[in-house]
Curated annotation (Swiss-Prot):
HAMAP family: NDH1_NuoK (MF_01456). This is NADH-quinone oxidoreductase subunit K. The keyword Aminoacyl-tRNA synthetase does not apply. It is a multi-pass membrane protein. It comes from Ralstonia pickettii (strain 12J). It catalyses: a quinone + NADH + 5 H(+)(in) = a quinol + NAD(+) + 4 H(+)(out). One of its GO terms (biological process) is ATP synthesis coupled electron transport.
């Protein structure tokens, strides 16, 4: 049984990144889908960090991924909280309807 090489992980990361790019360009209406695509993009980059870190034998990349995931979790929580407030005030999460500022 053959083990997975660095190229396998990099191809998987590239596929995940491409799926997130396609998700952003195809669905530009829903803010929740946009946030999920951006998070998938960040996870693809983190997968590449871990793959290179394991391949080079350096744990600094894996530790860096933990910090990135912590910041990404906080970013997601804040983004979803903003979306809840927008939905309560405007009754929509459509990107086209969020173009006006009210002071």
């Amino acid at each position: 049984m053959s083990s997975l090489s660095l190229a396998h992980y990099l191809v998987l990361g590239a596929v995940l990144f491409a799926i997130s790019i396609v998700g952003i360009f195809l669905n530009r209406k829903n803010v929740i889908v946009l946030l999920m695509a951006i998070e998938l993009m960040l996870l693809a980059v983190n997968l590449n960090f871990v793959a290179f870190s394991h391949y080079l034998g350096d744990l600094a990349g894996q530790v860096f991924v933990f910090f990135i995931l912590t910041v990404a979790a906080a970013e997601s929580a804040i983004g979803l909280a903003i979306l809840v407030v927008l939905f309560r005030n405007l009754d929509t999460i459509n990107v086209d309807d969020l173009d006006s500022l009210k002071g």
